[in-house]
From Swiss-Prot:
Coiled coil: none annotated. The keyword RNA-binding applies. The gene is rplI. GO terms for cellular component: ribonucleoprotein complex; ribosome. It comes from the Bacteria. GO terms for molecular function: rRNA binding; structural constituent of ribosome. Belongs to the bacterial ribosomal protein bL9 family. This is Large ribosomal subunit protein bL9. GO terms for biological process: translation. It holds the Pfam family Ribosomal_L9_C. Binds to the 23S rRNA.
């Protein structure tokens, strides 16, 4: 019996897959537990439309992420911090500091976990930092740390 999986089923397939399951397995387990529904022409057509809509939505999200990456590449986030001799900072500049300053300076709101900063910035100067905007879309942002007067 052909069924459309509504949830991931171990050993059978992922959500949205159309699979052949034995009649007994489908009637006694998959259908009553609402893990799958019978694959009729109407339900297959609906599934196809849903997948098309999801693909279009994902493409739009990727396009938005690419536009944002382009915009961020032109941004220079300036952060002032207290520093000692040799340009070493008292404390450090974290991803949270960078995101807050980016929001104040440019009005761009991002999640601090998207900033791919391995370790906090501990010295004066400029640094390019990667930002993961979407799966497969990584932007770069320039962060300049200057000495506070």
């Amino acid at each position: 019996m052909k069924v459309i999986l509504l949830k991931d089923v171990k050993g059978l397939g992922d959500k949205g897959d159309v699979v052949n399951a034995s009649d007994g397995y489908a009637r006694n387990f998959l259908l009553p537990k609402k893990v799958a529904k019978e694959a009729t022409e109407g339900s297959l057509q609906t599934l196809k439309e849903q997948k098309t809509a999801q693909k279009m939505k994902k493409d739009q999200e990727v396009d938005k992420a690419k536009e944002l990456a382009e915009r961020l590449s032109k941004v220079d986030v300036n952060i002032k911090a207290k520093a000692g001799e040799g340009g070493r900072l008292f404390g450090s500049v974290t991803s949270k500091d960078v995101i807050e300053k980016l929001q104040k300076q440019e009005g761009i709101k991002l999640d601090k976990r998207k900033l791919l900063l391995d370790e906090p910035i501990r010295e004066l100067g400029s640094k390019w930092i990667d930002i993961k905007l979407h799966s497969g879309v990584v932007g770069k942002i320039k962060v300049t740390v200057t000495e506070e007067a």
